[in-house]
Amino acid sequence: MQDTFSSPEHFTVLLREAVGGLALKENGIYIDGTFGRGGHSRFILSQLSKKGQLIAIDRDPQAIQVAQNIQDSRFRIVHDSFSAIPDICEKLGLTGKIDGILLDLGVSSPQLDNAERGFSFMKDGPLDMRMDTTQGLSATEWLRLVSEQDLAWVLKTFGEERFAKRIAQAIVGYNKSAVQSGAEPLNRTLQLAELIAQSVPFKDKYKHPATRSFQAIRIFINSELDELEKVLNGALNVLAPQGRLSIISFHSLEDRMVKHFIRKQSKGDDLPKGLPLREEQIQHNQKLKPVGKAIMPTEQEMAANVRSRSAVLRIAERI
């Protein structure tokens, strides 16, 4: 059953678990770093008093349009990437005062379902893939410029694609031939998906052959892992003591980064062995503590929303 805080076009993944992980204070100040279609934001607002505040951020212009329909004095929407959270907080005088940050790192259903955005290999549309369509190179433009070696690296690094070299050779070769013959280079999603499928010698019956390549290109185009690294490091200065991080990731690269970051910050900086330090001195060096174990969607949620099946939620608290 769809949650009442989700929109008709988008199921909000791990809604109650992610918001619950923030341990909301009714007068607290919170950040939803990935507004999307507002499921998490609306739920947070429903739990806050009149003195509470919520700052929502998204770099998708369509998400900003949705957010502008929320008429609530406690709510502020910012068109930016979540990596800008430290700068946004500094401008608002909120550095060190944030009680919780929620990040839902997935591509939203409206983004996937809108063929014009170019995220999906299941629908034909222009090969774009930008979260913010007002900035940067589209996938079409980048694929026209990239070398075979660099493309193979992207596919291998961000998609963990075992046939990265074959696929890169096919894509770059196609575009070179198109330029030489005066034809159009790759510029449609199904066109790229079919070319990738033809390049892969073995098919996985459970996964489309273009899945990993589309993921890799999208991650690179949007600098997704760089953005995540920036916000993780910046969150330490933004959060108030006992402030919470609640982060939902959707693939192993993101989850690995979040997991390792929390683990590193919960241990503190490396100290030379043999130093005569008391336990409280060692703990003073720690910046975060994990809250519980990783949380996955229930069978019921996965049945209602198949796209939630790869979601992993991790929660940490500022010390």
From Swiss-Prot:
Top-level taxon: Bacteria
First-level EC class: transferase
rRNA processing among keywords: yes
Reaction equation(s) it catalyzes: cytidine(1402) in 16S rRNA + S-adenosyl-L-methionine = N(4)-methylcytidine(1402) in 16S rRNA + S-adenosyl-L-homocysteine + H(+)
Single biological process term from Gene Ontology: rRNA base methylation
Record family assignment: Belongs to the methyltransferase superfamily. RsmH family.
Protein known as: Ribosomal RNA small subunit methyltransferase H
Species assigned in the record: Histophilus somni (strain 129Pt)
